[in-house]
Design a protein with these regions (language model features):
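Catalytic-loop of the protein kinase fold
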Residues: 197-215
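Long, solvent-exposed N-terminal ectodomains/accessory regions
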Residues: 1-60
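Activation segment signature within eukaryotic-like protein kinase domains
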Residues: 186-187
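C-lobe/activation-segment region of protein kinase-like
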Residues: 215-278
Length: 278
């Protein structure tokens, strides 16, 4: 299957991959998702590229067409339809497809669409039980009866970007950061949001500084892709490295509270050490 000559304009996702060896990790190629003639494709490239516009189409291999059913679930009348004209302070969350090559070979080739549907149901519940420290959901963006994205309120910045614009690892940041601005109210906001989720029988399961937005001094919890009901399995549920206990395999309230404590230590409050191993 040939690729378009102006591939750079149609590349949706690119990600370098690495494989482990006795001598450490080594570069194994670049994964790419691109659009051609209205269809989406997943491919692998042999080289590194600084920009999608530099992609050498002759390097494309393992090309797979991604069926719509793999990433866009069917819209149901029970769901909220997003406004046709979205507010300026909003954005559309669309599914990431960079791992589709692996997913397509598994037992759940439509798991991306299933995960989108799961997150929609979580947001619909949260919409009925709104809270100032939980992201505002505006509804589903729909095309031809399929959910193409989730429309959400947009917030200025993450807690991670505010505290750690240099993307230092959390231990190095903790050891070098001088505590200045008071973030106790932010921690209280995060806890209020967590407690609200727990009152609904939900656990976020991925509380970390990149999933906390800051808006006029208020903390808002975002990204409910890993959110599960209390007691549910966390098998195949994505969580953020360094911010969760890898031994925990089920959705427990303590998962969120432990992550909140990790953020508190990360912000420099107290002398405790980090719980989660790098």
């Amino acid at each position: 299957m040939s690729a378009p000559p102006n591939l750079g304009q149609d590349v949706l996702e690119m990600n370098e991959t690495y494989e482990d060896s006795d001598n450490g990790f080594y570069f194994a190629g670049t994964l790419m998702v691109y659009r051609m003639n209205g269809n989406l494709y997943h491919a692998k490239l042999k080289a590194r590229y600084s920009s999608p516009s530099n992609v050498n189409t002759n390097d494309l291999e393992n090309i797979i067409q991604i069926p719509i059913s793999a990433y866009n679930p069917t819209f149901s009348a029970e769901f909220t339809l997003a406004p046709e004209t979205l507010p300026t302070n909003s954005f559309v969350k669309t599914p990431r497809l960079i791992s589709y090559d692996r997913i397509s070979q598994g037992l759940r080739p439509n798991s991306i669409a299933e995960d989108v549907l799961h997150e929609v149901r979580i947001y619909e519940l949260l919409r009925r039980h709104a809270h100032p420290n939980i992201a505002t959901y505006l509804g589903c963006q729909v095309s031809n009866g399929m959910i193409t994205g989730l429309c959400l309120q947009k917030y200025p910045r993450t807690l991670l970007k505010e505290i750690n614009p240099g993307s230092l690892n959390k231990r190095h940041l903790r050891n070098t950061r001088v505590v200045g601005k008071d973030y106790t109210s932010i921690l209280a906001d995060i806890e209020r949001g967590i407690r609200h989720l727990h009152s609904l029988g939900l656990v976020h399961n991925d509380i970390n500084p990149n999933n906390i937005m800051i808006d006029n001094g208020r903390a808002i919890i975002i990204d409910f892709g890993s959110c599960r009901k209390l007691g549910e399995s966390l098998e195949d549920v994505g969580r953020t490295y360094e911010w969760y206990d890898e031994k925990v395999k089920h959705s427990f309230f303590e998962n969120d509270l432990a992550a909140l404590e990790e953020i508190r230590v990360w912000l420099g409050y107290g002398e405790e050490t980090f719980q989660f191993v790098e």
